[in-house]
């Protein structure tokens, strides 16, 4: 069936489908203001914790009740939403790649994963979040089902798509061919994922009704959509409209112009063009990575319809932990600052705040209970501080201007990036604990204050001089606005700049009038 015919059927389905937005659900504008803590349900918290060896690739016992018990830990860092693993029943047993503890090998769309808990457990999790003013984002998989044996697939185990005719014919994916990406099967010769025929009108209707009912039943506020690019683009607007909530899709490409095309079909996307280079910027002696990050941020801002609706992340279950690339705490603080203060909705992966250092799957997916829920750790405390600054900026008198402003990034040398977002100027460095001083020329004469240290930075004439000490990040805000909005109500200090420059650069900032 041709895509235009399928699109026509999609519109017909939607005309008959009653779309009810859940009472607690956020629209895309509400999600723009959130800060998301992403977690693997099986590895974050358990009501019966046991030692977990991630290299075994087995279920370790994490569950929804465990998450409820640890919401104080998440909220203590300032996060306002969580993103949990797919909730539906997956295939059982061991495959060549282990068990389906991650949730991405579905078997039954209408049954919850019993390893994670009951229907009531999931509803209680949603209620517990909403009672705190927090929100629930659920990962969803509708591109494929799971199979442990690609040579002998038993379609009868799947629900509701239990016939081979419900799937595209098996074929290997060719990455440079869009139709192949959409209709061929993800996997290897040892394990493959049967690709659902999302061109079939009856299947479209089934999936749209499924997600509508699931969101309503379990009080879901937003969806993370797996394998977005492996389903034709025109499928997604109807899917998200049926859900009645904000969707954030996985379109894994580093090319900003191609990436941004997808925002015509889904409001939210994981910001892969920025993530790919920003994560590399923590690698020691990687002189060009931070510059590439600034370029990527500006390209995404230019090409995308609205970069403030994207999800900005640096760690994930598919990527090395940042501390595996560099365990310098100062560098990781800067990375967290970038993660939380750039355009879009911040997403922090569980354990990032504890400086997990797994370099690859599966060792980058340990159980948090084995490491401990240390709320006194330096990066946990720092994450809480920056999240609070972001939240206070959003709640300020000019909060809407701030959160909707598009970031413009410029570089000073190879190791300092300056991000301008509305009235906020954020300095990010990646050279570690080294003293340097940078002379920034800016129009106007506003005294600024560093919201991280409550240090005043005076502007003389049209020149602001600010000293970056030991590679520390900075979040600058006009002092008059800070006073009005209640920032830094305790002790304020005046910046001291050494007379001897260990490194000096000059740059003209953009006109911010």
Curated annotation (Swiss-Prot):
Task: Provide this UniProt record's keywords sorted from A to Z.
Answer: Calcium, Carbohydrate metabolism, Disulfide bond, Endoplasmic reticulum, Glycoprotein, Glycosidase, Hydrolase, Metal-binding, Signal
Name any one Pfam family assigned in the record: A_amylase_dom_C
User: Looking at the record's lineage, which domain of life comes first?
Assistant: Eukaryota
- List the InterPro entries hit by this protein, alphabetically: A-amylase-like (IPR013777), A_amylase_C_dom (IPR015340), Glyco_hydro_13_cat_dom (IPR006047), Glyco_hydro_b (IPR013780), Glycoside_hydrolase_SF (IPR017853)
Question: What family does this belong to?
Answer: Belongs to the glycosyl hydrolase 13 family.
In the record, which residues are listed under signal peptide? 1-25
At which residues is glycosylation annotated? 162, 357
Broadest EC class assigned to this enzyme: hydrolase
The residues that hold Ca(2+) 2 are: 226, 250
Q: Where in the cell is it found?
A: Endoplasmic reticulum
GO MF annotation, one: calcium ion binding
Enzyme Commission code(s) on record: 3.2.1.1
User: Which GO biological-process labels does this protein carry?
Assistant: carbohydrate catabolic process
Name of the protein in question = Alpha-amylase mde5
SUPFAM superfamilies from the UniProt entry: (Trans)glycosidases, Glycosyl hydrolase domain
Cystine pairs annotated here are 52-60, 171-184, 260-304, 454-488
Coiled coil stretches, renumbered: none
Per UniProt, where does Ca(2+) 1 bind?
143, 182, 195, 230
Give the positions the UniProt entry annotates as the active site. 226, 250
Q: Which PANTHER family match?
A: ALPHA-AMYLASE FAMILY MEMBER, ALPHA-AMYLASE MDE5
């Amino acid at each position: 069936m041709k895509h235009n015919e399928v699109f026509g059927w999609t519109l017909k389905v939607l005309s008959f489908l009653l779309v009810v937005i859940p009472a607690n659900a956020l629209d895309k504008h509400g999600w723009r203001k959130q800060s998301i803590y992403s977690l693997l349900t099986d590895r974050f918290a358990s009501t019966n914790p046991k030692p977990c060896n991630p290299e075994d690739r087995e279920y370790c016992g994490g569950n929804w009740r465990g998450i409820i018990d640890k919401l104080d830990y998440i909220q203590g860092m300032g996060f306002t939403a969580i993103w949990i693993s797919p909730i539906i029943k997956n295939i059982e047993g061991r495959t060549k790649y282990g068990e389906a503890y991650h949730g991405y090998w579905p078997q039954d769309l209408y049954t919850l994963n019993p390893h994670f808990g009951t229907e009531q457990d999931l509803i209680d999790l949603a209620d517990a979040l909403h009672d705190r003013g927090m929100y629930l984002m659920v990962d969803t998989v509708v591109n494929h089902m799971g199979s442990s044996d690609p040579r002998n697939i038993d379609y009868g185990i799947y629900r509701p798509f239990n016939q081979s005719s419900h799937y595209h014919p098996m074929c290997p994916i060719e990455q440079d061919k869009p139709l192949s990406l959409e209709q061929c099967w993800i996997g290897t010769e040892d394990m493959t994922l049967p690709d659902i025929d999302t061109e079939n009108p009856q299947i479209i209707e089934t999936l749209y009704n499924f997600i509508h009912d699931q969101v309503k039943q379990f009080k879901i506020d937003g969806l993370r959509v797996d394998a977005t690019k492996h389903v034709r683009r025109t499928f997604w607007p109807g899917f998200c409209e049926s859900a009645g909530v904000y969707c954030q899709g996985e379109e894994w490409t580093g090319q900003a112009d191609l990436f941004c095309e997808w925002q015509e079909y889904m409001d939210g996307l994981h910001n892969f063009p920025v993530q790919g280079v920003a994560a590399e910027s923590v690698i020691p002696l990687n002189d060009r990575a931070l510059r590439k990050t600034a370029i990527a941020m500006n390209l995404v801002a230019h090409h995308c319809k609205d970069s403030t609706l994207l999800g900005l992340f640096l760690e994930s279950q598919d990527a090395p932990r940042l501390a595996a690339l560099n365990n310098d705490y100062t560098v990781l603080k800067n990375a967290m600052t970038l993660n939380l203060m750039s355009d879009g909705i911040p997403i922090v992966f569980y354990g990032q705040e504890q400086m997990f250092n797994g370099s690859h799957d599966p060792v980058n997916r340990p159980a948090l209970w084995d490491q401990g829920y240390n709320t006194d750790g330096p990066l946990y405390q720092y994450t809480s501080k920056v999240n609070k600054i972001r939240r206070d900026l959003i709640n300020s008198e000019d909060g809407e201007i701030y959160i909707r402003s598009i970031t413009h990034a410029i570089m000073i040398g190879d190791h300092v990036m300056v991000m301008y977002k509305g009235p906020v100027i954020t300095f990010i460095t990646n050279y570690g604990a080294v003293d340097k001083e940078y002379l920034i020329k800016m129009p106007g004469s506003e005294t600024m204050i560093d919201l991280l240290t409550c240090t005043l930075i005076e502007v003389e004439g049209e020149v602001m001089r600010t000293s970056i000490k030991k590679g520390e990040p900075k979040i600058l805000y006009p002092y008059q606005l800070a006073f009005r909005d209640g920032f830094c109500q305790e002790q304020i200090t005046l910046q001291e700049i050494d007379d001897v420059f260990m490194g000096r650069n000059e740059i003209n900032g953009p006109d911010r009038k």
